Structures are given as C-alpha cells and as structure tokens.
Amino acid sequence: MSNQNSTIIYTITDEAPALATAAFLPIIRTFAKPAGIAVETSDISVAARILGEFPDYLTDAQKVPNTLAELGKKTLEPDANIIKLPNISASQNQLIAAIRELQGKGYKLPDFPENPQTDEEKAIRQRYNRCMGSAVNPVLREGNSDRRAPRAVKEYARKNPHSMAEWSQASRTHVSHMHHGDFYHGEKSMTLDKDREVRMELLGKSGKTTVLKPSTKLLAGEVIDSMFMSKKALCEFYEKEIEDAHKTGVMFSLHVKATMMKVSHPIVFGHCVKIFYREAFEKHGKLFDELGVNVNNGMANLYDKIATLPQSKQDEIKRDLHACHEHRPELAMVDSAKGITNFHSPNDIIVDASMPAMIRQGGKMWGADGRLKDVKAVMPESTFARIYQEMINFCKWHGNFDPRTMGTVPNVGLMAQQAEEYGSHDKTFEAPEDGVANIVDVATGEVLLSQTVETGDIWRMCQVKDAPIRDWVKLAVTRARNSGMPAVFWLDPYRPHENELIKKVKLYLKDHDTTGLDIQIMSQVRAMRYTLERVVRGLDTISVTGNILRDYLTDLFPIMELGTSAKMLSIVPLMAGGGMYETGAGGSAPKHVQQLVEENHLRWDSLGEFMALAVSLEDLGIKTGNEKAKILARTLDAATGKLLDNNKGPSPKTGQLDNRGSQFYLAMYWAQELATQTQDPALQAQYAPLAKALADSEQAIVGELAAVQGKPVDIGGYYAADPAKVEAVMRPSRTLNAILEAATA
C-alpha cells in the first residue's frame, strides 16, 4: 500500500474521554502531519447517534450522518485503522436526559415513548432502542479481543503500587447466585449442520402462536443457544437472599450489567426492587401503573413519576417506601452523601466495575452511614457469578493481592460479530404467557430447540459464528507463542453452549503448531483458581474466554494489578484485515466531568489513548510501508515510558497536574524522542524546533494550565456540549496552542 492510505480514524465519544480528546487531537495532528498521516474523526457519541437516527425530524442544517453505521462499514475494509475511546452505553434514564438536552438546543426530536401504545410510538421507541445500551461495540467489533497490560504500565504499577485494603478471614462477604431456574440451568445448545433461517415463536397454552422474531439467518457451523430464566425462581431467590441478609445483618447489594444486557438485566433488576419494596408496591401499585412507573429503570424513575402528584401524596408514598427498610437489610450505596442506593438506577452498579472495586476494598462496599462494610453480592445468574466467589475465597485465605509482585492476566476474548450473550438483545423476550418457546427452521418447520416457559420468564437466543471461533483459537495460539505464557480456555463442559465450543476448540487447535506451548481447557472456577495460584507467585497466565468473561476479567485483573482497567492495551484485530485499538477497558467517568465543571480540573488519565495511538501508528506503518509512522510509534512508546517514570500522570486533586498537563508532557517527551532519534534525519530536523519550543516554555505552559483551575466552567451541555466552549476549557494555554499552531504552519 502507498502512504495515501495513511489514515487514522479517531472516535469522538462521551463524557471524560470526549473532553480529553478536545485537548489531545490537536497534539496528534501536529505529530502526524510530517509523517503524511491524516487523522479523521468519527462522532459516535450518544447525542450523535440519536441525531443520526432521526434525520426526518431535523432541519437540513441540523442533520448529521449516521456515523456509527458508516464506521461499522469501515471495519469491514482491510485498511481500517480506528482508535476507539470509551462511550456511554446509555440506560433509559440517560437516553431521555440526552434527548431532552438536544430538544433544549432546538432539535425537534420526538419525546421518548416510555409506554408506547400507537404504531407511531412503537416505531419511535424502536429507533430510540437502537441508541440504548451497548449500541456501539456490537457494530464495531468485527474482530476478537486482545487485551493486556503494557510492560511499561505493569512495571510502573510494581514500583508505585496502588492501595489494596486488607482482607480478613472473618469477612462475611460472599456472592449469592441462583442454583436453579437461571440461564445456566435452562440452556440448550447446538451446532448447525447447514445454513438455516429460523424464527422464534411461543406456542401459548391459550392455543395462540406468537412469533417473537420472524427471521434470523444462521450459517453452517454456527453455535446457537436457547436459554431462559424463570421469573418464579428469580423472585423466590430474591425473597430468600433479602431475608438472609436481614437475619444475618450483612449489607445487601445487587450486581447486574444493565448497560450491555439492555433487555434482560433491567428486568432482573426491576424484580428485585419490587420485592424489596413489596408493601409499598402492593399499596400503591395501581397508582404507579397509572403514572407509568417502571422500576426496571430504578427508583429514580419512580421518584420522577411521583413528582407530579400533590405533595401530601408524595410524602405518603415516600413514608411507605422508607417503612419497608425497617424489616429489610441495609442497602449498599452508590453515593452515601446524597442518599443514592444500589437501587437508584440499574446502570449505577455495573458488575464488571463494582465487583473488582469491592474485592480491592477488602470485600466491602459503602453503607448509608458512609462506612465500608461486608456485603452480600447478589448476582442472580450463576454462569459467571462463581468466578467472583472463587476470588473472594482466595483472598480470605491468602489475603489481598500485592501489585508489587503479582503476575499479569492478559485476555483473548471471543467477541467478533456479536458473539454469545452480548449479541442477544434483539433475540431476548419476556414470555407473554405460559407455553413452549421454539426456535424453528422457517423452510422446513423443524423445531431445532425447545423450552417450556411461564409468563414473565426471560427467553433468549444466543449465537456465535464459526469463523470468529476459528479466529479466536488462532489468536490464542499466537499470543501464547509470542508471550511464552500458558493460555487457558475458560470453558465449562457442563454448560451446553461451552461444551459445543470445547469441541470446536479441540478441533481447531489441530490447525496450529502448538509444540512447546502450554494450552489447557478448564471450567471457569478451576481456571480462576489455577490463574490466582500463579498470580500470587508472580507468574503470568493468558485467559482465553467468551464474550462476557472477556468483559468481566479485563476489568477484574487490571483493577487488582494496575488499580484501573483504563490503562489496558486493547487491540481488536479486525477479521477483514484492519485494526481497531480501544483505549483501555473502563468507562467514560461521569464523576470526572462533574469535577471539571465544578473545579476546572480533569483527572481523566489519557494513558490508554497514548498506548492505543502507538499501536495504531505501528500497525499503520507495517501495513502501508510508512516508515515514518513506525518511528512515531516507537518514539511515542518511549515518551509514554518517560511520562510514567517522571510521574507526570494526572492527579485527582484540583490545583495539581491534570489531563491537560499530562498531555503537554507527553507531547514534550515525544518531540524530544523524535528530535534525538537518528533513523530518519529529516524527521529529526522537523521535530527539533518543536522539542526546543516545548522544553523552553515548560514553566509557562504548566503555569497557564494550573492558573485556570479551582473555578467552575461552562461547557455548554453534557451529552451535547458546545464544541467551542469545550475547546476553550480544554486548551487554556495560549503558549502551548501557539507552539502547536506554528509547528503545523
């Protein structure tokens, strides 16, 4: 390829990473230009996705392209090079807030229909649903996942260990999960013998056949699953666990993944809320229905709805809700100071973030009195809950992990083409009546998989195509060979879906030379125990997992090792030949935005962006023959190492170095590395003046960046902030701006 293909697409997303991008993008372009590299942007923020979904409601001047769909097509091109930052996986509450903000800016979007009745309302709701939950990743992830802690970051964590609370063998913290009636115990699976088109239907006891999904096209070799969770068993489980927590005096917490599992987990969440506040719902249920209360969206939804009632009625309802707490366990808090509980919103406590944080804190979460306490962590679905209990058991026996000595656990994740549960949203349903749920071949009428379900049960179909499985096995072998680490496939032979995968893994491993490699297949609990026993001895182990465990483990282990998952290197080798580079494995940090608005200090650490950019440049250099890009990559890696060694990352404290200052130091170190490299004298000459200007102005720039802190700022919105105001806030150093401008003139 020629250097004409030297293009990087940098995503514009949400919250803290979007703010950091406003400062970092001009730096990237300054360094990329001399190497002939174009840096384009693609706005996939929740606001842009909403606007892209409703062009027919906008004026010509307001219309924006459907950038997510366009970027999805780009992932299918062999020269794709995409840097993907964390974005909001919008809950219903967040989506409504974003819609209202856009409406307030003059966009005449339709209101979000919470209880759609007419065909028009149902159509609008369907369009909005495409913007909800994890709407971005399934579109872009056309490859499997390779996530690991870069060597420089791991070494920094060893030299500068983050805090880890002590574990006590007397800790009462534990995980509670269902032992029957959940998806694990209600799963059937098969591998398709040929291409098929199937429909999902319910043969009701009433004699009525309801087609829930008329058509899904499947390929030969694809693994499909039919699984259901019993509403009755779920509610009985909640009753038992709430009562147990109350009797034993341990704090109660509920951990779901309502952002990614945007259909099933809000339902699972809502049942718990209703049972916890049963007496209040029994007394006011009819009124709540009239108001359109939907506790699948949390107690915040209930409080919003009752705000329209007379004050006396509001007070009565609140008294009845508070009265429920008298015979209920203490609830874990999201924000003790503000009285925000675990039940406030389903996306406030997300399992892959909340469980590692709890384990890091010695098995404790915050109570209403602002103190850390032992906790019952309720995770209804047993499929993956047991891995957390295994880690808790390990910590109770061995104590807390030591970041100075512990090994590392990279991950190779089966992710491509909406693999497994994370691709099941459009195939997940609440059973409208008792009956038999069938997956039926449209052409022949053959019933492929069948389940007996009851009203309110959650039934879903999952799928994973054969090509991604082959690619996943290949990636695991490659990483094991390149790293010298043992690789463990976390697969449970007693789970039907994973038993089908085990057959394929054993078959496709034969396609590779595995001589001298340590590759094993273990059930999740055994794999966790094996990995932890190595970790505490300072040994490294690759986890090779399905899509959900990819998500969970790439938060769990990095938070133990590094203190955060945002510092992970996350590479998605796209199956069409391109590459996508995700900046870390964490979220988009709304609290960082709050601090910026209140104090003009952004604590977001762009280390993930620095590392992703280096790999992106290296890949671009290899694939296009652009030697200058390779030099940029090597020098950026060196600059990032220097940044860590000199401790120039952002501080959480206002008045100290923040994201903007950290980015300045990265730019200065990068320019210095380029000015001293000798491989390309022309590049050396181009960057030498920039390196000198930045070094000479270090004191002035750092002073200008510090001077603006400590005062509130206006960025003109939250989901749709004003670009000009954001730029003014994020680029406050006139000296730095002038130097960058002169370098690209």
Segments (PLM) and residue ranges:
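Short, charged, amphipathic alpha-helical segments
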Residues: 684-692
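C-terminal accessory extensions/subdomains outside the catalytic/core fold
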Residues: 721-745
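Extended, well-ordered protein cores
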Residues: 2-270, 278-503, 508, 512-524, ...
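Short, solvent-exposed positions on alpha-helices
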Residues: 630, 681-685
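Ligand-binding pocket scaffold of soluble enzyme catalytic domains
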Residues: 675-678
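Alpha/propeptide regions of enzymes that mature by internal proteolysis
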Residues: 394, 692-693
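A glycine-biased, small/acidic residue-tolerant capping/turn segment at secondary-structure junctions
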Residues: 702-719
